[in-house]
Amino acid sequence: GMLFTATSLFSQVNISAGSTVTQNFDGLGTSATATLPTGWKVDKNNSVRSVGTYSGAGTATELIAGNNMSSSAQNGIYNFGAGVATSATDRAIGGISSGSASKSVNVYVQLTNNGTTSINNFTIGFDVEKYRNGKNSAGFTIQMYYSTDGSTWTSAGNDFKVSFVADANTDGYTSAPGATTSISGKTLSQSLAAGSSLYLAWNYSVTSGSTTSSAQALGIDNVS
């Protein structure tokens, strides 16, 4: 069975050996300035493929989008809806770059081992959903990172990377998301002692180079 454990007394997501944590972001609701679930944070910066710090990140989105996302959509942090942005119940979190801003959007979670035994490794899955095409020739990627302190990050590698190749246009989708790629059951070989925290970050950015115009809009969903 799936168990999402969080407490209002602490700002992290609690986990213990053998337990499962899931998050589908549907609790975001339909507000552009939606508050993230406990233990989750988000930020944006103007450097490509750059992860910030968990402590410095915020706890709310800035914008919403869903069906028919505009080719001139504002850059920033999005609460995406699978369907009509203002009413869809299935939500995801992510963003979109412009040529000069939001070159990276990062979604973070702090996992704290509140059990009595060490966790030897983590089995992780997540979906990457595409809410708008982008004709930037490099394409866009979501890459997961991990950290023991929330500020120094290590790439989790290709098993935790989803890239989309360039599209012919920057159109939205009549029925969003227009594409979904799932990462399922991949092992992150990182131990976590009782009482300690592990931080994960999902970085959205252009796949290569530094040109971020004509971007694809990507979000993450169904983290487990």
Please provide the spans of the model-predicted regions:
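Short beta-strand elements bearing conserved aromatic residues within extracellular beta-rich modules
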Residues: 142-144
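Bacterial N-terminal signal peptides
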Residues: 1-8
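Surface-exposed, low-complexity/disordered Ser/Thr/Gly/Pro/Asn-rich loops and linkers
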Residues: 45-117, 218
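Short, solvent-exposed loop/turn elements at domain surfaces
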Residues: 31-36
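Intrinsic-disorder/low-complexity, polar/charged segments enriched in Ser/Thr/Lys/Arg/Asp/Glu/Gln
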Residues: 20-22, 104-108, 121-123
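Boundary/junction segments of secreted and surface-exposed precursor proteins
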Residues: 8-28
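Terminal, low-complexity interaction segments
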Residues: 25, 100-102, 114-119, 126-129, ...
